[in-house]
């Protein structure tokens, strides 16, 4: 079984699609005259689908890699900000301790 045959969607197989449609206009389709074209078209559509799937997998890997890199950058930035906040809090607590000693 193949998808709906559309020359615009399956451009690599357009010639075979047209040939099969032309063959099906005659009575030859009832006597197996179109079978060779049909098998060639099936092979072409399978190759086209596999090529699209391979490209989709490659694109997904690239998107996943970019997302992972961004996540790591965000984690590093978050750690840096957390460290800065902790340092500021320590400075404040040391300053408050020193001010408290002078008041006693």
Curated annotation (Swiss-Prot):
Disulfide bonds join 13-44, 23-34. GO terms for molecular function: copper ion binding. The keyword Repeat applies. Residues 10-52 form the CHCH domain. One of its GO terms (biological process) is mitochondrial cytochrome c oxidase assembly. It comes from the Eukaryota. A motif (Cx9C motif 2) lies at residues 34-44. The twin Cx9C motifs are involved in the recognition by the mitochondrial mia40-erv1 disulfide relay system and the subsequent transfer of disulfide bonds by dithiol/disulfide exchange reactions to the newly imported protein. Required for mitochondrial cytochrome c oxidase (COX) assembly and respiration. This is COX assembly mitochondrial protein 1. It comes from Schizosaccharomyces pombe (strain 972 / ATCC 24843) (Fission yeast). The lineage of its organism: Eukaryota, Fungi, Dikarya, Ascomycota, Taphrinomycotina.
